Design a protein with these regions (language model features):
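Dinucleotide-binding Rossmann-like beta1-alpha1 core, especially the glycine-rich loop
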Residues: 46-121, 126-129
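N-terminal Rossmann-like FAD-binding beta1-loop-alpha1 element of flavoenzymes
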Residues: 3-30
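Flavin-dependent oxidoreductases
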Residues: 16, 182-237
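Glycine-rich FAD pyrophosphate-binding loop
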Residues: 22-44
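Short, well-ordered alpha-helices that flank and scaffold nucleotide-derived cofactor binding pockets
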Residues: 19, 23, 149, 153, ...
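Hydrophobic anchor at the start of a short beta-strand
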Residues: 26-28, 113, 189
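Helical element adjacent to the flavin cofactor pocket in flavoenzyme catalytic cores
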Residues: 131-188, 192-199
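Local beta-strand N-terminus motif with an aromatic residue
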Residues: 3-4, 78, 186-187
């Protein structure tokens, strides 16, 4: 099988790229190791639509996040949850960012940062600042279904699930990818695997990115009525 582009990973970035390339008339093949799309970082790690508040030590990243926040909200407003108060707070203990620094950072990045009393949400002495911000979450299942509907309209785009690349090699001017019993070739490969980026780099003979991996747990619980429609993030780094 020969296509114009092989995309590895059927998360948000992979399906976005597939939809854009497919709409431009390119033949696209998406390889996904899981039995369905959006099963990893897109669902587990990225439900927040970032405005940039997470990056007080990188103004450039924060500014880029704010820019793409507006774009994401414009393009995918149908999957957003916006009707809640998003509170950011700075830990009073073991944090590299205190309340004064967070205020300066938000002012420099030109993103909303309205002071609220920390005691409204936290025990006394736990946080030295709390702020009402503008940041949203999205429903990954709604967004996934939208992308699948768009891709279904493009006969030149194919997604193969449960297909983890076993081997990638350069053959002349194209890349040959083997995944199980399937072999495909393309002059262009997009690695959209996120946490699995170094697995693909190893197959390509490229040096690995110096990435620190941390386990992530999603805790589902029923909250007190006073915390309904409130999102809370504590900055302790």
């Amino acid at each position: 099988m020969t296509v114009d582009k092989i995309i590895i990973g059927a998360g948000l970035y992979g399906l976005y790229a597939a939809q854009k390339c497919g709409a431009a008339g390119q033949r696209v093949l998406v390889l996904e190791r899981d039995p369905a799309p959006f099963m990893r970082a897109t669902y587990i790690n990225q439900a927040r639509v970032h405005m940039g508040y997470h990056y007080p030590r990188s103004y450039s990243t924060a500014i880029k996040s704010a820019h793409y926040f507006q774009r994401f909200c414009r393009d995918y407003d149908f999957c957003l949850h916006t009707s809640f108060d998003q509170i950011y707070a700075t830990s009073a203990h073991f944090s590299w960012t205190n309340a004064a620094e967070f205020r300066r950072f938000c002012a420099a990045a030109k993103i909303r940062c309205d002071d609220v009393a920390p005691e409204r949400y936290f025990n006394n002495g736990m946080c030295d600042g709390a702020f009402l911000t503008t940041e949203y979450t999205y429903d990954a299942q709604v967004l996934k279904n939208w992308f699948l509907e768009q891709l279904a309209k493009l006969p030149n785009v194919q997604v193969l699930y449960s297909h983890k690349p076993d081997k990638i090699e350069k053959v002349g001017s194209v890349w040959r990818v083997t995944a199980g019993d399937t072999t495909m070739e393309a002059p262009f490969i997009l690695n959209a695997t996120y946490a699995g980026v170094n697995d693909i780099h190893a197959m390509l003979g490229l040096p690995p990115f110096k990435i620190k991996y941390e386990k992530c747990e999603i805790i589902l619980c029923t909250v007190d009525e006073r915390l309904k429609n409130t999102g809370i993030t504590v900055m302790d780094g």
